[in-house]
Swiss-Prot record:
This is D-amino acid dehydrogenase. Keywords: FAD, Flavoprotein, Oxidoreductase. GO terms for molecular function: D-amino-acid dehydrogenase activity. FAD binds at residues 3-17. Its EC number is 1.4.99.-. Belongs to the DadA oxidoreductase family. One of its GO terms (cellular component) is plasma membrane. One of its GO terms (biological process) is D-alanine catabolic process. It comes from the Bacteria. Disulfide bonds: none annotated. Pathway: Amino-acid degradation; D-alanine degradation; NH(3) and pyruvate from D-alanine: step 1/1.
Length: 425
């Protein structure tokens, strides 16, 4: 059976790999000249099941106003005359209740934990390397009020048997000795001991090579113009390089998925939320992070990737343009110098932005559509790297008509098409 995967980011490449392992004849098309060159290119580098959380939560509407007014805040909203944006914002606000947050977080932790296990199995199977480390994530709190507010998250971690440690200042320094120089800057932390880190782009490149060795055909520099439907199914995909026809089709185009699906009458609540990162060469090894430190005040992740430090964060809602805004870099620089002063050479940093495909409730959208042969694997938000292997395994099992190893019903598009469509039931 022939399958066409649209998108060669970490989601598309991972899906293609597992499809090929399952015996499908796979083609992947992407507009870029190689794999993982958009959202997967320079993300924060975390594989963080324990930190998987929806952005929509109790108190977020109030915090959002504060963040927008703070020039170093983690949220920027650039108003657009775009009904899709405002529908997405309204849906997100409706998910900002304690009960919805708990439900959505449990769904996200479930797929993320499964994905981490799939990644480990893949690593053992083919020996793939990507500057990976398995030394946990430290969520660092500068204020006591932040530390006091983690009770609900901790209960969900217990529910899913996710190992964690609540640490005082000394415990944080034991986990990340580089913090010793700034020990008065924070009060404590939550350490997620099973979380990992790694270079998502390097992983995507190397898995693409493994998939190609299994017979996957990667077609680059090919822009999709339209998806053509006939008789309740996809009949083909029209591109600037010609028409592609397959038996099954997988949508893995991240933030751009809705633009191609909308003409088919398939409306998915995925909207781009731009993130920024800097990648900094290490100049002082002892002063550098060992793994990932999440600066809870700025919502910034500081991650060790080999001989580099990746600092990623901020959320900019408003358009599909990856343009760099220098004032966003100031926040990233500030977080790094606050917590790991002198660790990296900021004068040699590279600055990047990418579009995260966010759903308003948090979990991704994986599953069938009203077109019989069109499948979705999109909307992973900030957690595409964390969820990639598990999401791909779920999608491939569904395409094989095999029951996935986890309950994936709550990840389907149907959660937006019920009586609670505005919530993501």
């Amino acid at each position: 059976m022939k399958v066409l995967v649209m998108g060669a980011g970490v989601i598309g490449v991972t899906t293609a790999y597992y499809l090929a392992k399952a015996g499908f004849e796979v083609t992947v098309i992407d507009r870029q000249p190689g794999p993982g060159l958009e959202t997967s290119f320079a993300n924060a580098g975390e594989v963080s099941p324990g930190y998987s959380s929806p952005w929509a939560g109790p108190g977020v509407p109030r915090k959002a106003i504060q963040w927008i007014l703070d020039r170093h805040g983690p949220l920027v909203v650039r108003p657009q005359i775009d009904p899709a944006m405002w529908r997405w914002v309204v849906q997100m606000l409706r998910n900002c209740t304690a009960s919805r947050y708990a439900l959505n977080k449990s769904r996200m932790v479930g797929i993320a934990e499964y994905s981490r296990d799939c990644l480990r199995a893949l690593r053992a199977d083919i020996g793939i390397t990507y500057d990976e480390r398995s030394q946990g994530t430290l969520q660092l709190f500068r204020k006591q009020s932040q530390l006091d507010a983690i009770g609900g998250d901790v209960e969900i971690l217990r529910q899913y048997n996710v190992p964690f440690e609540v640490l005082d200042r000394a415990g944080c320094i034991r986990a990340e000795p580089g913090l010793a120089a700034v020990q008065n800057s924070f009060v404590g932390g939550l350490r997620l001991v099973d979380d990992e880190t790694g270079d998502c782009h390097l992983f995507t490149q190397r898995l693409e090579a493994a998939a190609a060795a299994l017979g996957v055909n990667f077609v680059y520099e090919t822009t999709i113009r339209s998806i053509d439907a006939q008789g309740g199914a996809v009949a083909g995909v029209t591109t600037d390089k010609g028409r592609f026809v397959a038996d099954r089709y997988v949508m893995a185009l991240g933030s751009f998925s809705p633009l191609l699906l909308r003409p088919l009458g398939i409306d998915i609540p995925v909207y781009p939320v731009k993130g920024y990162s800097i990648t900094v060469p290490i100049v002082d090894e002892p002063a550098s992070p060992r793994s990932t430190v999440m600066d809870e005040s700025y919502k910034v992740a500081i991650t060790r990737l080999g001989d580099r430090i990746r600092v990623g964060g901020t959320a900019e809602i408003g358009d599909y343009q990856p343009r760099l805004r220098p004032n966003r870099r100031v926040t990233l620089d500030r977080s790094l110098t606050d917590l790991f002063p002198g660790a990296g050479d900021l004068s040699q940093a590279t600055f990047w932005s990418g579009l995260r495909p966010m759903t308003p409730d948090g979990p991704p959208i994986i599953g069938p559509t009203r077109l019989a042969n069109l499948h979705l694997n999109t909307g992973h938000g900030t957690l595409g790297w964390t969820m990639a292997c598990g999401a791909a395994r779920v999608a491939v099992d569904q395409l094989r008509s095999v029951e996935p190893e986890i309950d994936a019903r709550a990840l389907s598009l149907s959660r937006y098409q019920s009586g609670a469509a505005s919530l993501g039931a």
